[in-house]
Each structure stands twice: as C-alpha cells, then as structure tokens.
C-alpha cells in the first residue's frame, strides 16, 4: 500500500534537513528522500572536516558537525527518512496530489519541496597526462580526512575560497602546503585572503601546472609554468589536491513529469518559495529569484518560509504557530 504524506522533501542537504525539522514542528506528515546513503549534502559528502563560517551561531563548524547537528534537530520532531533512494519521477495527479516514484517504492504526497541543490556534482579534473591514473593516490579532489595528508608536502591547486580553505585546513597537519594559482590575485573573501597572508602556506602565483611525473619514492613532481612568461619551475610534493570547483547537473529534474519554470538550470520561485507548479516548492542552491545569494544560511531562511506557507495552503483553517517557542517543544 502506498504511503500518503502531507509533504515530500526531495534532497537531504542542510536546507532539506531544516525543512524536515519544520514539518515536524508543524506536525505535518512528511518524508525526506535523499539519493546519497547519508544526510548532509555537499558539506558532509565533500568537506566533512572543513570549517564552515557562514552559518549564524555556528562559528567554524565542520561540514560533518553541521550535518550531525541538523540530524539531531530533526529528532526533536521526527519525520520519515529514506536514504540511498533516488527519485526517478514526480507526477501531478488530477486531484492535485503527487505520486513520487523511486527504484524502491512509490508514495503519494499533497505537496513537494525540492531541496536538491544543483544536483549531482563532480570536480573539475586536472587536465594533465597521467593525472587520471593517479586519482585517489597522489592526486586528490577531496580532503575528507586531513590526517591523510599528515607530515606530507601538499600542492593545492586553485584560487577561490574553497582552495584557500583547503590549504588553511591542512596547514597544521602537513609538512608544507603550497597554493598554486594562475593569477596573482585570489578570488576569495577578504578575511580568507588575510588568513592566507598570515599563514605559512607558500603561494606560487601566477603559475599553471604544465605536466607531472611520479618519482621513484612515489612523490610527484609538478612542472609549473609562469603565466605570460617562459619561466618554468619544478615542485616536488607528496600529494596534489585539486580544487578547480565543481560541475553540477540537475538532469534528474528533466526526467520528471513536472513542467517547472527555470532560468539557467535553476528553478524559479516566488517570495514564498513556490514554483510555477501549484503545490511544488523549492529551496536551497538550486533555486533562483531576484537578489538570491547561494549560501547555506540563505537556505535556512528559505526552508521555514516554504514549509509555513505550504502548511497554510494545506490546512487554511488551522492556526499555524510561527515561532518554535509557541509550539510546546521541550
């Protein structure tokens, strides 16, 4: 027999998890579906030990700590959770309800909240001969466990916030960290750059990796070419950590039987987080509206906005408390 829900949240990153918590507060029958085998989205999957600074009241929380805190918060007002389950289709029925299909089961829901971020993500690869064969060994795209780099020489490639954060995170465990960027200036927050300037990290700019070779002791020599010059220099390291950003793809949405208005691959929403399809809301990095800022903190504001407004639509005669202090928790 199909399960019937008031709300189905698709995506178990920070915004989706906070939305699930709010469903529990409003005593809505809700399910949270996540394609990965664990909750937490990109912070938990990509940088569990990296510190996140843009969450109010959580100064320097790691990606995994943030996911754990959100999971504990959901337990205050639990909802059904289905992990390792990819939604293959969402169909709007004639009565306005939705049928949600996955490879494992089928369920129905009165409303949908899409919290899938930018969809499946993959790192931009180091385009050098031999780099692919070294993936997971000398060449890495993630620093999930900084102890993997203990007492090693590490070259971090990239010049944005994420690259600098990775370099700073490894500074206290690595023997030496090098930051290689093709420009003289870094594209990062001023505070982050100030931390870099005060660190022991050796900045190599403006250089671009030209080739790499594996040495007899399994270290790697990166040959760096200076931009707009003939100068080259070798750099011998134990690990190369590439941080050129990620490509993302919400192709799964295109397979669903929902005609969602979008802009450059992101879902258009109004001030209540409604999409162009009645009964479907969207929150997080995968949505667009005027003035949108793609931060975890922004998603935390969008989640209660979406849940409170859809709750009013589902139960217009029910008085909806807005503040948790009015909901009898604790």
From Swiss-Prot:
Keyword Oxidoreductase: yes
Entry's EC annotation: 1.18.1.2
Enzyme class, broadest EC rank: oxidoreductase
Superkingdom to which the source organism belongs: Bacteria
Binding site for FAD: 34, 42, 47, 87, 121, 285, 325
Repeat among keywords: no
Entry's cofactor comment: Binds 1 FAD per subunit.
Cofactor list: FAD
Reactions performed catalytically: 2 reduced [2Fe-2S]-[ferredoxin] + NADP(+) + H(+) = 2 oxidized [2Fe-2S]-[ferredoxin] + NADPH
GO molecular function per UniProt: ferredoxin-NADP+ reductase activity; flavin adenine dinucleotide binding; NADP binding
One Pfam family matching this protein: Pyr_redox_2
Keyword terms of this UniProt record: FAD, Flavoprotein, NADP, Oxidoreductase
InterPro entries reported in the protein's UniProt record: FAD/NAD-bd_sf (IPR036188), FAD/NAD-binding_dom (IPR023753), Fd--NADP_Rdtase_type_2 (IPR022890), Ferredoxin-NADP_redctase_2 (IPR050097)
Sequence similarity: Belongs to the ferredoxin--NADP reductase type 2 family.
Record note on quaternary structure: Homodimer.
Protein name: Ferredoxin--NADP reductase
Source organism of the structure: Limosilactobacillus fermentum (strain NBRC 3956 / LMG 18251) (Lactobacillus fermentum)
């Amino acid at each position: 027999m199909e399960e019937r829900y008031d709300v189905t949240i698709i995506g178990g990153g920070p915004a989706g998890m906070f939305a699930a918590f709010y469903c529990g507060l409003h005593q809505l029958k809700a399910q949270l579906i996540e394609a990965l085998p664990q909750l937490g989205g990109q912070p938990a999957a990509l940088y569990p030990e990296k510190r996140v600074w843009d969450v109010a009241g959580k100064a320097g929380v790691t990606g995994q700590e943030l996911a754990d805190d959100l999971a504990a918060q959901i337990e205050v007002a639990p909802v059904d959770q289905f992990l390792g389950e990819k939604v293959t289709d969402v169909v709007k029925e004639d009565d306005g309800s939705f049928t949600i299909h996955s490879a494992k089961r089928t369920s129905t829901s009165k409303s949908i909240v899409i919290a899938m971020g930018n969809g499946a993500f993959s790192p931009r690869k180091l385009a050098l001969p031999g780099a692919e064969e070294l993936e997971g060994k000398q060449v890495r795209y993630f620093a999930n466990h900084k102890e993997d780099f203990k007492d090693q020489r590490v070259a971090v490639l990239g010049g944005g916030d994420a690259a600098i954060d990775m370099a700073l995170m490894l500074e206290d465990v690595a023997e030496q960290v090098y930051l290689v960027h093709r420009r003289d200036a870094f594209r990062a927050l001023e505070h982050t750059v100030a931390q870099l300037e005060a660190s022991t990290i050796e900045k190599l700019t403006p250089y671009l990796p030209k080739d790499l070779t594996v040495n007899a002791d399994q270290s790697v020599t990166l040959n760096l070419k200076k931009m707009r010059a003939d100068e080259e220099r070798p750099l011998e390291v134990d690990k190369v950590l590439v941080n050129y950003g990620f490509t993302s793809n919400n192709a799964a949405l295109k397979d669903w039987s929902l005609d969602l208005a979008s802009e450059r691959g992101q879902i258009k929403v109004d001030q209540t987080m409604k999409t162009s399809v009645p009964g479907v809301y969207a929150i997080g990095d995968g949505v667009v509206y005027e003035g949108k800022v793609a931060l975890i903190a922004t998603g935390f504001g969008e989640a209660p906005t979406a849940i409170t407004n859809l709750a009013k639509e589902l139960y217009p005669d029910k008085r909806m408390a807005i503040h948790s202090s009015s909901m009898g928790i604790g």
